């Protein structure tokens, strides 16, 4: 029989708010050891000096344990004020991975139910558990969290892999209409004369399906914005329009539009993040970031001050985490070309887990011909589970996945980064074509490459070999001007790789000379 008098007389248990103490008290699994030195130092610094900061950037090297740091910060703030705490990931794959990490460390979290994806978990709303979900759940025109004044109040929010999240946020404001959609033809017809006057030859190529790019003249766009609105509003349930239209419908004059033979893109010149009050009005906004990234969007997009961006929370004594060896095969010997490397590492006799990152599905065809596995968002989890079960004979291919995929330890011992990344959207592509070689475009490419290099080494004891193939990427990384924009760690790894190239070239030359001398001696006899 329950004695309710004891329950009524019991004092509420005091909740710890020091993140180090919280971690010590968690019911962790046996393989979850103590905090790493970096995690310990960062959390102590945050608790002592930065926990009152509304806007905070946490900058650490890839594989330093940012996920656990973010979860412990949220748990600390949840224990302190009891307000809803939200942990946002770039994609569903990382949502599942973060939930597994939380379970491993004994942190109480919740997710959207698979049975009812349209109901926000009550444990999150009541401040009992941290909600882990993908960035698209919050940032879209039909968000369950509400837009403008009608939004769910959130106490604290963490953006994990914040630069990958930024790409998703920008995408949420964009309308992308494919050529086979009736809207494509209607919009093309609306601006046909304007495009013809601008570049009639390119327009003809676009009509024939060319990937060439034109921007719709801004004066024509503004003049015809009402006709554009009428066309888009007539298709409210079209999946290319549905989730972005509520965000753009009253500000088309502040948008820009681009057209190719494959589709049309409409995107805002400035992303009105303020529409998402759950994020912009949160008491604490914590962005987890790698040390190599361009942080300009934190200012112009999220409203962070320059001072907040210039003073991130870092580990002042951090060292390199894990071991990477970068190799440039084509610089050692021209016979070690891109296609020869694909053929070599596609050999199923190689019983080592290996992945290749390619910029497009078109370029993945070379792998498909060799029997490799080209992953998509639905198959990636299964591929990694197969690797963990010992099935490591296949080379797996990630298409344009330079971020949002973590491949620690035996998940990936050989990582191939194939060719220079390409732009995800037409506005970035247009900027790159107009400002080729500018610092802005170089930084964007460097950021993508650095993100790709960080997929395979995720911890202090982790290691992998990274193979760089594709002449455009090799030239970009070896060019003194563009190489200067990489992080100090990557620049050092490129320097070591270059020394190795010179050493191996000399060995090959010496070996060839020795063989030639042997032939000469044999000729004498």
Predicted regions and their residues:
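Inter-Walker segment of RecA-like/P-loop motor cores
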Residues: 93-97, 102-149, 380-387
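Conserved RecA-like P-loop NTPase helicase motor core
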Residues: 386-475
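Conserved coupling segment at the C-terminus of the helicase ATP-binding
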Residues: 41, 51, 55-57, 61, ...
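Conserved Walker A/P-loop ATP-binding site and its immediately adjacent core
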Residues: 64-115, 136-140, 291-297, 357-365
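Long, largely alpha-helical accessory region at the distal end of helicase-like NTP-driven motors
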Residues: 459-525
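Structural recognition of the conserved hydrophobic beta-strand(s) that form the central parallel beta-sheet
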Residues: 87, 131-134, 156-159, 284-289, ...
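Conserved helicase motor "Helicase C" RecA-like lobe of SF1/SF2 P-loop NTPases
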Residues: 358-378
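Conserved pre-motif I regulatory segment
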Residues: 3-59
């Amino acid at each position: 029989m329950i004695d309710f008098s004891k329950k009524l007389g019991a004092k509420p248990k005091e909740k710890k708010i020091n993140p180090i103490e919280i971690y010590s008290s968690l019911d962790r699994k046996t393989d979850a050891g103590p905090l790493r030195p970096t995690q310990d130092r960062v959390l102590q610094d945050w608790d002592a000096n930065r926990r009152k900061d509304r806007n905070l950037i946490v900058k650490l090297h890839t594989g330093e344990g940012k996920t656990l740091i973010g979860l412990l910060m949220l748990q600390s703030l949840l224990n302190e004020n009891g307000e809803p705490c939200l942990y946002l990931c770039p994609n569903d794959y990382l949502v599942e991975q973060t939930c597994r990490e939380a379970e491993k460390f004994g942190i109480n979290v919740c997710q959207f139910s698979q049975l009812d994806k349209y109901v926000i978990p009550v444990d999150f709303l009541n401040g009992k558990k941290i909600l882990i979900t993908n960035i698209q759940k919050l940032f879209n025109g039909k968000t369950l969290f509400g837009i403008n004044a009608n939004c769910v109040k959130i106490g604290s929010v963490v953006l994990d892999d914040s630069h990958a999240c930024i790409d998703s946020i920008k995408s949420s404001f964009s309308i992308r209409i494919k050529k086979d959609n009736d809207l494509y033809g209607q919009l093309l017809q609306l601006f046909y004369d304007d495009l013809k006057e601008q570049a009639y030859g390119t327009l003809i190529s676009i009509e024939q399906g060319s990937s060439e790019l034109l921007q719709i003249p801004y004066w024509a766009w503004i003049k015809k914005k009402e006709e554009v609105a009428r066309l888009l509003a007539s298709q409210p349930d079209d999946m290319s329009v549905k989730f972005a239209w509520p965000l753009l419908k009253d500000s088309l004059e502040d948008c820009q539009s681009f057209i190719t033979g494959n589709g049309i893109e409409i995107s805002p010149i400035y992303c009105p993040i303020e529409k998402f009050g759950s994020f912009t009005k949160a008491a604490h906004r914590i962005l987890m970031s790698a040390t190599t990234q361009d942080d300009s969007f934190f200012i112009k997009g999220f409203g962070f001050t320059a001072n907040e961006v210039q003073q991130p929370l870092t580990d002042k004594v951090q060292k390199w985490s894990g071991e990477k060896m970068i190799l440039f095969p084509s610089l050692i010997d021209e016979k070690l070309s891109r296609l020869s490397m694909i053929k070599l590492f596609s050999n199923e006799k190689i019983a080592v887990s290996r992945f290749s990152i390619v910029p497009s599905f078109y370029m993945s065809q070379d792998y498909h011909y060799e029997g490799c596995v080209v992953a998509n968002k639905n198959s990636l989890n299964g591929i990694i589970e197969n690797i963990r079960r010992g099935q490591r004979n296949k080379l797996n291919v990630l298409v344009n996945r330079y971020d949002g995929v973590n491949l620690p330890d035996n998940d990936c011992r050989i990582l191939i980064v194939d060719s220079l990344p390409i732009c995800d959207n037409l506005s970035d592509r247009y900027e790159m074509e107009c400002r080729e070689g500018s610092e802005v475009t170089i930084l964007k490419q460097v950021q993508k490459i650095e993100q790709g290099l960080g997929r395979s080494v995720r911890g202090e004891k982790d290691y992998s070999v990274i193979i760089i193939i594709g002449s455009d990427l090799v030239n970009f990384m070896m060019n003194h001007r563009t190489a200067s924009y990489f992080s100090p760690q990557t620049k050092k790894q490129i320097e070591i790789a270059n020394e190795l190239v010179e050493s191996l070239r000399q060995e090959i030359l010496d070996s060839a000379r020795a063989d030639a001398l042997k032939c000469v001696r044999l000729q004498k006899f």
